């Protein structure tokens, strides 16, 4: 469902932001 999609998107977003912050 949409909740599962949002959860996956949230995890991906956090990982992406983490990499951006490290740069």
Curated annotation (Swiss-Prot):
Primary localisation category: secreted
Subcellular location: Secreted
Protein name: Magainin-B2
A biological process term (GO) from this entry: defense response to bacterium
Keywords from the UniProt entry: Antibiotic, Antimicrobial, Fungicide, Secreted
Family: Belongs to the gastrin/cholecystokinin family. Magainin subfamily.
GO cellular component, one term: extracellular region
Keyword tRNA processing: no
Tissue and organ distribution: Expressed by the skin glands.
Role this protein plays: Has antimicrobial activity against Gram-negative bacterium E.coli ATCC 25922 (MIC=50 uM) and against fungus C.albicans ATCC 90028 (MIC=100 uM). Has no hemolytic activity against human erythrocytes even at high concentrations.
